[in-house]
A protein has these predicted regions:
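Cys-nucleophile CN-hydrolase/nitrilase-fold catalytic domain and related Cys-dependent amidase chemistry
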Residues: 17, 26-112, 174-197, 201-204
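Short amphipathic alpha-helices and their capping/turn segments at secondary-structure boundaries
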Residues: 22-36, 155-164
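CN hydrolase (nitrilase-like) catalytic-core segments centered on the catalytic cysteine
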Residues: 64-82, 148-244
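Short beta-strand scaffold segments in enzyme catalytic cores
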Residues: 83-85, 96-100, 134, 224-226, ...
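A short C-terminal boundary segment appended to hydrolase-like catalytic domains
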Residues: 255-282
Length: 282
């Protein structure tokens, strides 16, 4: 099966839900007209990143009764969408979230599990951490979603791999850091190495949508990528600018790669479980 994925590497307007929604809908229509199957937006694509105490005022509920998601669900009749937003639960806790929409239905929501609160980042002051990492079924196969810092920890992609995810969708709002006279930012080079490593180690497709533009002194570098199950780069978006970058992947490559390199077949989660119990409980 072939799957045409588009990475919506956008610049968002901080706190402006309507302007960001309009951009989502316009890109969804453009991607649909081009025959795209799945359009992947970055982290907090509907709100902007440096929200701090703005978070409650831009939160949404991923359901048809929400005015923002009503329009996004309608747009998902033509192609599947992964969008970034602030989710509010029934106890009024706020989460950095991504939603997967398909054929007018909500398929899955992921709440960011790891909230960086160091250096440039202050997420733990304003958001609650998610408490689950689960793969989900789509019309194209079994996928997993992660958000930025989740991918810097080995456990979430590993759990999704064990849970059956054959395509890892990764959304981020990653600012540029570390020029040091090199041709690439240190941060972008590190992210690309990590994405390539996960694709090869887990013999999965890894699609990463990173935002671009400036916000509150941060420069988001873009450079969105797709890697195949051999760890080879399929496509990369430009650095530091908005783009809609599209590639067609062949899901049959999973069969070819895993037949040649049966890492999933030989994985021993029961060993991991036993050793984790020893480490955690003595």
């Amino acid at each position: 099966m072939k799957l045409k994925i588009a990475l919506a590497q956008i610049n968002t307007k901080l706190g402006d839900l309507q302007a960001n929604l309009d951009k989502h809908l316009a890109l969804a229509e453009q991607a649909r007209a081009a025959g795209t199957d799945l359009l992947v937006f970055p982290e907090l694509s509907l709100t902007g990143y440096v929200l701090q105490d703005l978070a409650p005022s831009v939160s949404c509920r991923p359901e048809d009764g929400d005015p923002v998601f009503h329009q996004l669900l309608a747009a998902s009749q033509g192609l599947d969408l992964m969008v970034g937003f602030v989710d509010e639960d029934s106890r009024h806790r706020f989460y950095i979230a991504s939603a997967y929409l398909s054929r007018g239905q909500l398929v899955h929501v992921h709440h960011k599990v790891y909230l960086p609160t160091y250096g440039l980042f202050d997420e733990g002051r304003f958001f609650a951490p998610g408490n689950s990492v689960r793969a989900f079924d789509t019309r194209f196969g079994r996928f997993g979603m992660l958000i930025c810092e989740d991918f810097w920890h080995a456990s979430p992609p590993y759990l999704l791999w064990l849970d059956g995810a054959d395509v890892l969708l990764f959304a981020s709002a990653s600012p540029g850091r570390g020029l040091n006279g090199e041709p690439k930012l240190e941060s972008s080079a590190w992210v690309e190495h990590t994405n390539r490593a996960y694709a090869g180690l887990f013999t999965t497709f890894v699609a990463h949508s990173n935002r671009s533009g400036f916000e509150d002194g941060l420069n988001f570098w873009g450079g969105s990528t797709i890697f195949d199950p051999n760890g080879k780069l399929v496509i990369q978006a430009p650095y530091f600018e908005e783009s809609l970058t599209t590639a067609e992947i062949d899901l049959n490559q999973l069969h070819r790669t895993r037949a040649r390199m049966p890492l999933l077949r030989d994985e021993r989660p029961e060993l991991v479980q036993r050793e984790l119990e020893r480490i955690l409980h003595g």
